[in-house]
Each structure stands twice: as structure tokens, then as C-alpha cells.
């Protein structure tokens, strides 16, 4: 089990200790680390809604280091990012693969960033089915609908054509931060905090 660091803050009322993620949440920073799954998505959605209630005019920063995960869990985060009033800036630290890359590109245009050595990977959604032939056919139709929708959204976010994104996501497509910028998935590669507009 990972140890989560604690930070101690001095206030007029004495000392207060926070786990590091709670302290950063006060600065409107949310971490999306690890596999995107339902529990994680619920926590991130709750944090987005909380920060919107705190100040609907102030940007929220979503730091992403993820190998991807469950499409529907990622879409819950994506839809909430677009539903709330504050702009959600995205920043890739480490990797943003699959659904992680989709969420990275789904940040507010002009506020999508990656650190210099970050890696981004896009591909078509993965799935598997078993059971009766009819059930497998239903699952196949659903994954094809998701593939079409994700491709369309990624084309909108990147400025690429639907056909190009469809071709580029046929297999795992790895990119450096600079390549992700050139593709349109992010707006800027950051080398220092001062570069965040």
C-alpha cells in the first residue's frame, strides 16, 4: 500500500495537517493517477463539482498520469469537465494513454499541457465479449458506436479529420509531448510553472 504524504500548515488557529492531495485540492489541483475506473471517476467527478461550487469562475487543473481504462468511467469525467462552469486545464505528467489521452485532449482549448518527457498514446477502444452469439453481436455494436463517438470527439479536440484520427487509432499510436502538440491533442509543452497562462 502506498504511503500518502501529509503536510502541516500553520494557521491563526494552530496547526492543521492534510494529506497532500487534499492540500492540493485547496489550490484547485485534481490528480488523475492510475487506471481510469468507476471508483476513481466518481472521486474526480465529486472533486470537480466541489471546486465548481467553491468558485465557478476559477480554473481547475487536472493532472493526468494514466495508462487509460474503462471508457464509460472516462466519459463520466469528460462530461463533467464540460458540464461545469470553470475551465478545466489538463496537464500530462508521465503518460496519458487511451482514455487518459482522450481526457487530456478534452481540456479547455488553450489550456491543455504536457511536460517535456510525457508520453501520449491514442488507440481505438478495447473490448471483449463472451456468451451467446446475439450477446456478442450486441457488445460488438456497442463498441463500434463508442469507437465512432470517441473518434469524432478526438477529431474535434485535435483539429484533425475524422478519417485521420480513425486511421491513427487503428493501433497503439505513441507520441512525445511535442508530437502530441503537433497533432493537436495539447496546446503547449511546459518546461516551467511560469509558462502556464
From Swiss-Prot:
Subcellular location, principal: cytoplasm
InterPro entries: ClpP, ClpP/crotonase-like_dom_sf, ClpP/TepA, ClpP_His_AS
Superkingdom: Bacteria
One GO BP: protein quality control for misfolded or incompletely synthesized proteins
Documented EC number(s): 3.4.21.92
Gene3D superfamilies: 2-enoyl-CoA Hydratase, Chain A, domain 1 (3.90.226.10)
Entry keyword tRNA processing: no
Catalytic-site annotation from UniProt: 98 (nucleophile), 123
UniProt KW keywords: Cytoplasm, Hydrolase, Protease, Serine protease
Catalytic activity of the protein: Hydrolysis of proteins to small peptides in the presence of ATP and magnesium. alpha-casein is the usual test substrate. In the absence of ATP, only oligopeptides shorter than five residues are hydrolyzed (such as succinyl-Leu-Tyr-|-NHMec, and Leu-Tyr-Leu-|-Tyr-Trp, in which cleavage of the -Tyr-|-Leu- and -Tyr-|-Trp bonds also occurs)
Keyword Protease: yes
Molecular function terms from GO: ATP-dependent peptidase activity; ATPase binding; serine-type endopeptidase activity
Annotated localization: Cytoplasm
GO CC field: cytoplasm; endopeptidase Clp complex
Pfam families given in the database record: CLP_protease
Function: Cleaves peptides in various proteins in a process that requires ATP hydrolysis. Has a chymotrypsin-like activity. Plays a major role in the degradation of misfolded proteins.
HAMAP family reported in the protein's UniProt record: ClpP
Family: Belongs to the peptidase S14 family.
Subunit record text: Fourteen ClpP subunits assemble into 2 heptameric rings which stack back to back to give a disk-like structure with a central cavity, resembling the structure of eukaryotic proteasomes.
Protein name (record): ATP-dependent Clp protease proteolytic subunit
